């Protein structure tokens, strides 16, 4: 969850940027690395099996990044869970950026 400082900086300095968040609700890069290394070393490391859970999950509760962004003056939309909602949200976000404000679109993706 490295987002808050970036949101604040863009708001503070009036930077009209578009942030499309790939929200997999965790740091799954580390999960994949641990799984890859455990396979290489012939060990069992999978989510919830023998060795226990691996990786960092940022869920339950899920962070509402769009509300965090809005609290700092951003235009924000999300969470986008249905792919059919993405195009309209991006069009609205681009319009907000063209109007001079930062915009965030929180897009939920598969946790991997």
In which residue ranges do the predicted regions lie?
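Thiamine diphosphate
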Residues: 1-111
